[in-house]
Amino acid sequence: MRFSFMSGGKGPTQGTGKRVAVIGSGPSGLAVAGYLASKGHEVTVFERLPLPGGVMVFGIPEARIPRERVLGGCKELEEVYGVKFRTSCKVSANGDLLLGDNLAKENIELQGVVDENDATIIATGTWNSRGLPAENATYKGIHSALEYLFRCKANELGLISRKERIKLGRNVAVIGSGLVAVDAAIEATAEGHNVRLISIEHQFDSPSGSYEIGRLKKKGVEHFERTVIKKVLGEGKVESVETIKVNAEIKAGVILKLEQIPGTEQIIEKVDTIIVGIGQVPTPPFNKEYRDIKTLRWGGIEVNDRYLSSKGKVFATGDITTGITKVGRAYQTGLKTAHWVDRYLQG
C-alpha cells in the first residue's frame, strides 16, 4: 500500500527546511505524511500504539486490508522519504485515556509538538464507542466492537496475551450494520461463534453496503433488520434479549426519526454475548476543558475549508473532522488536507 503519492516512488524533492508533525497514523494521517514528505518537508508521525497504521492494523480484519501491505507502505515512507515514526508515543493536552493507551511508553505535551514544528496535523480518529441504548446495558457480556477487534489484532501481533482478548460466549449478537459491526461479525464467525446481526437499517440501507451484509448471510449470520434491542435479559449477565421492530428515517448516517412498532416485541433466546458497533466518537488529543482548539457539538475538531483549526498552524484531518468514514474517504480527506498544509508552508 503506497502512501507516497506525489513522486512516483522516486523519493522527495529538494528539502524545504519545514518541519511537520502528524499526530495519528491511520489512513488520513499516512496520506498527509506521504504527500508532505514527497514535497520535501521534514515529517514526523506520532503514534500512541506500537505500530503505525491505526485502525487498518488494529481493527480491520486481515482479509479486508492485509496489515503487511500497510506496514510495507510505512516502511517505504521511512526508508525512501525520510519520514520519522515515533510509535508508542502519545501526544495530548490532558487527553482522556483511550483504547490501547496502556501500550504507550512515552507521553508528550501537545503544545510542545506545536511549538517545535511549522505545522501540526491532528489525525487521531474515532477511538471511543457509543454504548448500547437499551435497558440493562451494563450487564456482563456486553462489549464494544472496536475493543473486541483491537484486542484480537493486538494479540495476533504479540502485544497482549491470549487471556487479554475478549472472551465471547457461544451465541453472539452484533449490534449495527456499519463496517465496524460487520468486521466484528466476520471475526466472531471466523472464531466459530454463532452470530446474529441486529440493526435498525434494512440490508439495502446498511452503512457497510448490501454486499457486506450478503456476505455475512452466506457465512450463516442471521440478520434481524429494522430491529433494536429493547432490553437485555438475564441475572446480571447477558442470557437473552428482547427486541422490537422500528421505523427509522436516516439521512447521511444520522437518525432523524426512530419509532418503535408496538406489538412487534420478540425474545431472542440463547444470547450470551453482545458486541456493540453502532458508532464511534471522535477522540481529539485533548479533553473538554482544553479551549485552544475549537470542537463541534458532536466532538469533532472544527476546521475551515482548508482544514485549518482555530489554533494557528494546527490542522486536522480524517474522521476527527468528519466522523467515522470508510478508509478510502479518510485517505482522500488526508490528501486534501496535505495540499493546503503544503500551500500554507510555502507561504
Show the residue positions of the predicted features.
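FAD-site-proximal beta/loop scaffold in flavoenzymes
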Residues: 138-169, 251-324
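Ferredoxin-like iron-sulfur electron-transfer modules
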Residues: 5-23, 28, 57-58, 89-90, ...
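Short hydrophobic core segments
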Residues: 116-125, 272-278
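Mid-to-C-terminal Rossmann-like scaffold of FAD/NAD(P)H-dependent oxidoreductases
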Residues: 215-218, 228-239, 247-249, 336, ...
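A conserved FAD-binding loop/helix module that cradles the flavin
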Residues: 320-347
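Beta1-alpha1 glycine-rich phosphate/pyrophosphate-binding loop at the start
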Residues: 16-98, 130, 135, 179, ...
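Glycine-rich dinucleotide-binding loop and its adjacent helix/turn
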Residues: 2-14, 76, 85, 129-191, ...
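Conserved beta-strand-loop-beta-strand element in the redox core of flavoprotein oxidoreductases
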Residues: 93-114, 234-266
